[in-house]
Design a protein with these regions (language model features):
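Flexible, solvent-exposed loop segments that connect beta-strands
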Residues: 23, 30-41, 62, 67-89, ...
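Sec-dependent N-terminal signal peptides
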Residues: 4-13
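Short, positively charged, low-complexity/disordered linker segments
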Residues: 123-152
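Gram-negative (and chloroplast) outer-membrane scaffold detector with strong preference
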Residues: 45-122, 144-150, 179-182
């Protein structure tokens, strides 16, 4: 009986050693980008959700992220106002390297995936288009743990969004959010 208890204990301890930690982060923030064929910067907002797996609670995490970015800009050309509105739905793999203690971590992350985009230009004539393309970039941020399993997140991300038939460009985001570790 003692032997069985010892074996069970050793198996449970070894399972803990190879276990993984999971994190979910929901964030939102301010986004900005230079819109091609205009002289103004598009500004707007972003919401984002990330599910991350952290093998053996180490410093490397692997995540899947999905978000929505909404940008708009207006300019006057030849006495008419042209309003550009862009929406983007990026879906990407988000590897992360974390440094720090159990209460405070800083991180560097990547982004590699695709995005589905909507473009709308309004003036005397309204033009609408949709497209699909590459989404990739990187960022950095911090995590402050309020409890062992709850943290607040702040980060900056810059990503290249390309499209097959119309506009490409850099999109920057400054965001904050809340996360849960389980």
């Amino acid at each position: 009986m003692k032997k069985n208890i010892l074996i069970t204990f050793l198996i449970l301890v070894s399972m803990k050693a190879i276990s993984q930690e999971n994190m979910v982060t929901i964030s939102g923030g301010y986004s900005f980008a230079n819109i091609e064929d205009t002289d103004v910067k598009g500004t707007g907002w972003r919401i984002n959700g990330v599910y991350e797996m952290n093998p053996m609670a180490g410093k490397f995490a692997h995540g899947i992220a999905i978000g929505y970015i909404n940008l708009s800009a207006s300019e006057t050309i030849a006495q008419q106002t042209v309003t550009s509105t862009i929406g983007s739905l990026p879906v990407y793999y988000a590897p992360k390297v974390m440094f720090g203690s159990d209460k405070f971590k800083i991180f560097v992350k990547g982004a590699l995936g695709f995005q589905y985009a909507w473009l709308k230009r309004e003036a005397l004539v309204t033009i609408k288009d949709t497209d699909f393309g590459f989404y990739g970039g990187g960022g950095a941020g911090l995590m402050i743990f309020l409890k062992e399993n709850i943290f607040i997140n702040g980060e900056y991300e810059i990503a290249w969004a390309s499209n097959s038939s119309y506009k490409d460009g850099w999109i920057s985001t400054v965001s904050g959010g809340i996360g849960f570790k389980f």
